[in-house]
Amino acid sequence: MALKPSPRADMSAITPKASSHANLPPLASRFVEVNSLPWEKSKYPGIETKTLVVDRSTGVLTMLMKMAPGAKLPDHEHVLIEQTFVLQGSLICGEGECGAGDFVWRPAGSRHEAWAGPEGGLMIGIFQIPNRFYEDGREVDFLGKDWEEAWGAAYERHEHARFA
C-alpha cells in the first residue's frame, strides 16, 4: 500500500544559494554541498553563517554558524526549542559551556547571551522558529528584521496547530 503524501509535502523549504535544487520534484531529497555555499556575514561582529535549510512559512531553520574568538550573540529569546551541536571550539553562556562534540538544547522561552570561547566556534543550529533578539527597545531576528513581521505568522501557525 502506498503512503499518502503528508500535508507538509507542500512546505516552502529552500536552501538559499543552492541553485541545483531549482528543478527538483517537490518530494525529492535535497543534498547540500555545504562547502560550496558562501559564508554570509551577520550583523553581529565575528559571526558568519551558512543557511542549510529555511522554511519561512513554518519557521524551520538550520544553519551552520562560525564564530570568531569571543564573538557574541547579544540578549535573545528562544521562541521555540533551539538545538545546537558544536563541531569545533566552544559556545558559552551564563549557564555553562558546550565544547566540540557536545550538544545543547534550550527550551522555548529561555533568554540569554552567548559567546564563542578563545578558539572561536563552529556549530550547527536547528530552530523551530528563529530567535528573537532584543536591541534598543526593538524585537528583531538574526538579520535585524522586525521579528513580528519576519516570523510572527509562522509562529501563529505553529501555535494554532499545537492547540487545534
Per-range role (PLM):
Residues A68-P69, H78-C93:
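Glycine- and acidic-residue-biased ligand/ion/polar-headgroup-sensing regions
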Residues M67, L80-E82, R138-K145:
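Short intrinsically disordered coil segments
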Residues G46-E77, P107-R111:
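Conserved short histidine dyad/triad with adjacent acidic residue
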Residues I92-A116:
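Short acidic-glycine-tyrosine-enriched beta hairpin
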